[in-house]
Amino acid sequence: MEIICRSVFRDLEAGANEGNEACALAREKFCYEVAKYVGAYAAALNGIDVLTFTAGVGENDVNVRAAVCEYLSFMGVKIDPELNGNRGKEMVISTPDSKVQVWIVPTNEELMIAQDTADLVKAAK
């Protein structure tokens, strides 16, 4: 199986949506790994109250959020498919009966990098 996707996640998503099996497998593996780590942290913390999707993929990729939450359904995670269709808007996307609140929280990664860089430059003087 040949992977014909670049490293940019939206290209991977587009490939998966166009039927590229390798891209679909890579996306599924990504979602599985995210859910695995959330599950591990939930076990270590004796449960979670909130699951937050943020940054480029988390705040914009409807399919990733749906797949990750489906993997976590054993914990009572339930999302509203209509609300999950939103991108880049701060909001709760879980259903009222979900045992875990699921949020989308936008971030400005470039601004954070610029602020951290400015702090490092100041500290180096």
Task: Give the label of every model feature segment.
Residues 49-71:
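Glycine-rich phosphate-binding loops at beta-strand->alpha-helix junctions
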Residues 2-5, 9-44:
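Adenine-nucleotide phosphate-binding core of ATP-dependent small-molecule kinases
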Residues 11, 40, 67, 116-119:
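Alpha-helical scaffold segments in soluble metabolic enzymes
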